[in-house]
């Protein structure tokens, strides 16, 4: 589709951004997988674990399986002045949460320092199987202890207020201790993190400048490769050739090729709805690698998020399959924000199926949900990679509020799923108990190496 300037100005993207319009060229046509709402005979029980051990926690931006097969989560506190993030681990023996440490204490950057705080870990857990290390990097947004809010632009040159920088922590999951830490990104937060274990390299996207960084874990050195844009993608992924992939502001694939040592942009734009989108803001929100590592499944961070399957090892640029919208039908002439219209938590389970959480909300035309229930909810879907059929298997039930926004998902060594919740307090994580026929030991392997 070639979008003319006049057509774009009429669209919901707005006249102010008309010059951003780009042609929508994708690698494949949409597939016809039909959603199925009845989960059948297999029931998927859910459990809720609030962050009661960290009352200030207001978001959970990261959930990951560690190299030990256990589930780790970030209990973030970004709205309270002086708030800090705590590392949490699910304890399968007590069926509860263990609070391992407050990260500010590990990196000598206390919450009451007067600077912007080490308030969250944002899509930035990255495991290392060889030595049992779980890497994690912090993001910014938490205000100083005596300020109501924090602006990284306003405080960039203020040594008393400026965020010290993303703290990179190496946590030994065998010894339960932090073995070292470093400043990964001075003055900036880490939006997302990836670990190339073979080459001992960490890759990160910075905020607010949206630069692409490489950190050598052996030499403890960092390198700024360059700027991608203004809208951070929310994840990175790695292919068999050790190339790192993400997206730019306009929905193009961006890759870093170590052999060429440069950032490259695809000639096409990722799938989106051409009725009211042109690719702008169609950045990756979440990506999960298929078990054979030949393809990845991705969801975009935009109202009406799109699901897609990408084959990064094929051709000069990957083949991209458009799997269609992740969320329900709606009136495209009416705005809907990305907190309500959302898809996240992509994770492959031991049964070889893709699971993810997509929001659903009350709509008088497209989804007339009962008035007696919540006006929105988070639905756990199972997608069959062979047929691309989607099946609803569970709904996440928060005791006091809707739970439509899931940040990340993970599978533990027992084969059960965990999802991070973002909303109002109390926040925490959900556990989805897979039926015995779909669980297997060490279901987390091969392990996910990006946040």
Regions found by a protein language model. Give the residues of each.
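Blade-level signature of beta-propeller repeat domains, shared across WD40, Kelch, NHL, RCC1
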Residues: 404-451
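N-terminal export signals
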Residues: 7-28
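Repeated scaffold domains used in trafficking and secretory/extracellular systems
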Residues: 58-61, 109-125, 188-194, 231-237, ...
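Conserved beta-propeller blade signature
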Residues: 71-72, 134-135, 201-204, 243-245, ...
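Beta-strand-rich domains and repeat architectures in extracellular enzymes and scaffolds
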Residues: 50-83
């Amino acid at each position: 589709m070639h979008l003319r300037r006049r057509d774009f100005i009429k669209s919901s993207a707005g006249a102010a951004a008309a010059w951003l319009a780009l042609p929508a060229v994708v690698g494949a046509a949409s597939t016809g997988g039909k959603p199925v709402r009845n989960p059948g005979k297999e029931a998927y029980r859910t459990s809720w674990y609030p962050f009661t051990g960290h009352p200030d926690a207001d978001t959970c931006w990261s959930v990951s399986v560690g190299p030990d097969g256990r589930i780790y989560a970030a209990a973030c506190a970004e709205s309270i002045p002086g708030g800090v993030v705590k590392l949490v681990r699910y304890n399968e023996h007590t069926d509860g949460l263990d609070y391992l440490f407050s990260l500010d204490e590990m990196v000598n950057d206390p919450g009451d320092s007067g600077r912007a705080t080490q308030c969250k870990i944002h899509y930035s857990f990255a495991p290392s199987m060889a030595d049992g290390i779980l890497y994690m990097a912090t993001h910014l947004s938490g205000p100083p202890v005596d300020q109501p809010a924090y602006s990284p632009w306003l405080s960039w040159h203020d040594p008393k207020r400026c965020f010290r920088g993303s703290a990179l922590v190496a946590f030994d999951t065998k010894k339960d201790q932090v073995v070292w830490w470093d400043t990964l990104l001075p003055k900036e937060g880490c939006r997302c993190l990836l670990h190339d274990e073979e080459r001992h390299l960490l890759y990160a996207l910075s905020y607010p400048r949206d630069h692409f960084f490489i950190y050598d874990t052996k030499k403890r050195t960092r390198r700024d490769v360059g700027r991608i844009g203004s809208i951070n993608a929310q994840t990175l992924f790695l292919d068999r050739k050790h190339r790192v992939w993400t997206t730019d502001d306009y929905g193009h694939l961006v890759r870093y090729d170590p052999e060429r040592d440069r950032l490259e942009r695809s000639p096409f734009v990722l799938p989106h709805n051409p009725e009211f989108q042109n690719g702008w803001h169609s950045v990756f929100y979440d990506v999960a690698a298929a078990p054979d590592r030949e393809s990845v499944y991705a969801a975009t961070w935009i109202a009406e998020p799109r699901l897609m399957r990408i084959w990064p090892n094929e051709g000069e640029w990957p083949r991209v399959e458009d799997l269609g919208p992740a969320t329900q039908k709606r009136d495209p002439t009416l705005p809907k924000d990305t907190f309500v219209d959302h898809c996240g938590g992509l994770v492959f389970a031991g049964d070889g199926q893709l699971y993810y959480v997509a929001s659903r909300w009350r709509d008088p035309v497209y989804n007339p949900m009962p008035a007696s229930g919540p006006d929105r909810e988070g639905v756990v879907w199972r997608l069959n990679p062979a047929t691309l059929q989607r099946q609803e298997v569970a709904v996440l039930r928060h005791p006091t509020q809707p739970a439509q926004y899931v940040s990340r998902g993970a599978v533990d060594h027992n084969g059960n799923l965990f999802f991070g919740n973002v909303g109002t307090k109390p926040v925490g994580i959900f556990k989805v108990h897979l039926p015995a026929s779909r669980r297997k030991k060490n279901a987390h392997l091969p392990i996910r190496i990006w946040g």
